[in-house]
A protein has these predicted regions:
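Acidic, glycine/polar-enriched metal-coordinating patches/loops
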Residues: 1-72
């Protein structure tokens, strides 16, 4: 896997980037009370989009954020 810069959205339905955080694969970051997990870009990358894993109330929801990742 790669390290990437991941821009987190304002909220789950909003793909606009308001911050960029250096993020390693399979590690968590907490943003506005929501935990996000990086996946392997080689398997999750689709048309310059990346899937982040959101953990909320014991269920996982896949969210597609467009144009928010960059190779380091």
């Amino acid at each position: 896997g790669k390290n990437v810069l991941v821009g987190l959205p304002r909220n789950p339905q909003d793909g606009r980037v308001i911050t960029v955080i250096p993020k390693a694969e399979n590690t968590w970051v907490n943003f506005n009370g929501v935990n996000y997990m990086r996946y392997n870009s080689s398997t999750r990358e689709v048309n310059n989009s990346i899937y982040l894993k959101r953990y909320e109330t014991r269920k996982y929801v896949y969210e597609k954020m467009s144009n928010v990742w960059f190779e380091i």
